[in-house]
A protein has these predicted regions:
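Active-site loop/lid in soluble adenylation, ligation, and acyl-transfer enzymes
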Residues: 2-123, 235
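ATP-dependent carboxylate/phosphate-activation module, predominantly the ATP-grasp catalytic core
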Residues: 47, 106-152
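Short amphipathic alpha-helical segments
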Residues: 47, 51-55, 148-156, 160, ...
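A short glycine-rich, hydrophobically flanked beta-strand micro-motif that places a catalytic Asp/Glu
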Residues: 73-79, 168-184
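Conserved metal-phosphate-binding beta-hairpin within the catalytic cores
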Residues: 95, 175-194
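C-terminal helix-cap and adjacent tail motif
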Residues: 113, 196-237
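Phosphate-binding core of ATP-grasp and ATP-grasp-like enzymes
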Residues: 113-130, 161-174, 197-202
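A long amphipathic alpha-helix within ATP-dependent nucleotide-binding catalytic cores
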Residues: 144-176
């Protein structure tokens, strides 16, 4: 597939999105830029864009094989990928298997507590409001998504969790929690979009409990570039 790359449509914290000669396809470019604390902390993680691009593409393809529709179309090079153009549903969809991060402060649960069942959370994607947590009643009342869309999103989110947990465990990695984003195709179909990477997931070494994700940057622990490379090595060889 050969699409002509055109003007930049959007630039976010970690990616740039470009139009192409096909109105249904865009090109995503993954950057090394890193932010934390609502954008208060800024920096770079060496080769993060390469890791996130390759890892996300590989995982999206595995999820497709398990019946979860994704935006993935074609990897172009180390940092660029063609994906289906979507209208992003303005919800961050968070699945938690183990207590970590802000959840421990919010709920008073010690970090590392294994939940009996996965927790599904929504936050409203709005930078000005700092992405507040909401429930599905908010989403309906604010017209962020329909009930049918929310049901589909929840179904896919739990399925993604099942598939990813197994993939990660095979690589001796615990899937602690992760954030997903979904989008609508031009016909209204809901598909998985954005990325699946150490930027959007918490990965712990299953033996040592060592962090293998963006928490190393968030907490100024160091070693984040090596951790990202380690995840890619374990999952992609």
């Amino acid at each position: 597939m050969n699409y002509e790359v055109k003007e930049q449509m959007y630039e976010g914290k970690a990616k740039q999105v470009f139009a192409t000669s096909d109105p249904e396809i865009v090109m995503v470019h993954y950057k090394d830029d890193a932010t934390a604390g609502d954008g208060e902390k800024k920096g770079t993680i060496r080769d993060k864009g390469i890791v996130n691009n390759k890892l996300s593409n590989a995982l999206m393809q595995k999820l497709e094989k398990e019946g979860i529709p994704t935006h993935y179309v074609q990897e172009i090079n180390d940092r660029d990928t063609f994906v289906k153009k979507v209208e992003i549903v303005p919800l961050e969809v968070i699945v938690r298997n183990v207590a970590a991060g802000h959840f421990t402060l919010r709920m008073g649960v010690p970090e590392g507590t294994q939940f009996k069942t996965p927790i599904l959370e929504f936050s409203y994607k709005n930078d000005d409001l700092h992405d507040p947590f909401i429930n599905h009643y908010y989403a309906l009342a604010l017209d962020l998504a329909t009930q049918e869309e929310l049901d589909t999103i929840a179904k896919y989110a739990f399925k993604v969790n099942e598939v990813l947990k197994k993939i990660m465990l095979d690589a001796n990695i615990r899937l602690i929690d992760f954030k997903l984003e979904f989008g609508r195709l031009s016909d209204g179909t809901i598909i998985l979009a954005d990325e699946i990477s150490p930027d959007t997931c918490r990965f712990w070494d299953a033996t040592t409990g060592a962090h293998l994700d963006k928490d190393l940057f968030r907490r100024s622990l160091g070693g984040e570039a090596d951790a990202y490379q380690e995840v890619m090595k374990r999952l992609l060889g």
